[in-house]
Structures are given as C-alpha cells and as structure tokens.
Amino acid sequence: MSGHHAYQMYAHVTWHTWKRVGCVDAAAAIDVRSAVASACQATGVRVFRDAVLANHVHPVVSFRPDIRLSDFVRLAKSVAATRVSRRVTGTVRWARGYFVTTIHKRDLSRATRYVADQFQRHPDLIPRNSRRPGML
C-alpha cells in the first residue's frame, strides 16, 4: 500500500454562547481566536477564515479524514472559556453542541467570504471593549 494520501475536506463550523448572550468582548475575542489556533495545532485542523462575534464563532476549516471535528470544537471551546476566565471568572459560557456543514472545494471561496462578511452582516455583534474594567 502506498504512503500517498490526498484529501480535500472542508467545513464551516459554528458554535454560540449560552442562550446567545453577547458576552464576548474585544479582549475575549482575542482569547477565543488564540484558543481556536491552539485547538488547530493540537488536532491538525487548519483554519482558512474565522470570525469571532459577541455571541458566536465561525471558523472555515480543512481537516484530514482521520480527524474528528468534535474533538477540535470541544478543545477550542474549552480552551477559550479557560483563557477568558483567567481574566474574569465565568464570563464566557458556551452552549452545548455546534453546527457543521461540509463545503465542496468549489464553494470554499464563497464560504470564506461569508465568514469574512460577518461584521458587516451583524454590526451589532462586533466584540467591543468592555465598558467596566474587568467586566464583559
């Protein structure tokens, strides 16, 4: 059997905060993006484009056939909540579960454009600086 493996697997993943509470501020958004990057490194997932909004996260990813996206999402959500909680305990709480849809390679640019346009689509959900120090 050959050692050659080729694959083109892409997905759009989303998850949101508990009860869609807009608890992700600008500092927390940095922590969430960092957590997603850490989860990618640990699981072998690659992010093409992402958007972190006040109440949900949108990464467009590529992954190997032996990768379970549930492991990536679980790790990203867990690490993000832990990092944000280091600053202010209990500020970000994720809802259970996530949504994922696979993307054909020909639709990849459309999916990444959709994610890139999230701030225009939801200007009210752009993570803002906290108004009160230490509070999200």
Show which residues each predicted segment covers:
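Basic nucleic-acid-binding interfaces
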Residues: 1-136
